[in-house]
């Protein structure tokens, strides 16, 4: 990792992006022991409006907490992918929720249907953000899976630990398949639905 690593988690209000940013920042800062800054913003609408959370990671104290040139962009809807992709570095990591993102600006993207997995596997769309965190922890070098799990379990309501742990692992499994496809084909196609659901 360089001295600074910039992450933007983006989508619409109601997708749990702010909580996701907080959990990711705590995983990196508390459990992995790096310097971290987390900020967030909402569109003028509440649920359904635009939402983003930024996490800046560094080996030293952070003097500017806003993301400018992204090392990692997670896009949970089409609008955020279109709007923020130009901010991604040429060698940056793009992860999209292919439930909603169908027009992808580069072949070098990891496509995982976070929301569809949440609906079909867990019958709860609310865990899509935790599935996305699991995928991010496997695809990005910036945070360990162990730190993410510890941060998630410290944040979620009592009694939902198993659900959230399973959601994390579902995200990791889906990301592993996407990564294997990338390695094999040098592009990352959508993971077939039947393969995704059979792997949890």
Regions found by a protein language model. Name each.
Residues 1-200:
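Active-site cofactor/cluster-binding pocket
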């Amino acid at each position: 990792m360089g001295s600074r690593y910039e992450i933007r988690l983006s989508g619409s209000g109601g997708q749990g992006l702010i909580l996701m940013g907080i959990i990711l920042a705590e995983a990196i800062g508390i459990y992995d022991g790096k310097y971290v800054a987390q900020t967030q913003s909402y569109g003028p609408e509440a649920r359904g409006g635009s939402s983003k959370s930024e996490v800046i990671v560094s080996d030293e104290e952070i003097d500017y907490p806003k993301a400018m040139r992204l090392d990692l962009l997670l896009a949970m809807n089409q609008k955020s992918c279109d709007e923020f992709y130009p901010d991604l570095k040429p060698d940056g990591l793009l992860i999209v929720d292919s439930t909603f993102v169908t027009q992808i600006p580069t072949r070098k993207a990891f496509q995982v249907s976070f929301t569809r997995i949440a609906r079909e596997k867990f019958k709860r769309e609310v865990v899509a953000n935790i599935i996305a965190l699991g995928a991010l922890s496997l695809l990005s070098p910036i945070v360990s899976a162990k730190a993410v799990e510890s941060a998630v379990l410290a944040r979620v309501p009592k009694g939902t630990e198993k659900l959230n742990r399973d959601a994390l692992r579902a995200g990791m499994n889906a990301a592993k398949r996407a990564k294997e496809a990338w390695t094999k084909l040098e592009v990352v196609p959508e993971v077939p639905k039947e393969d995704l659901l059979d792997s949890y």
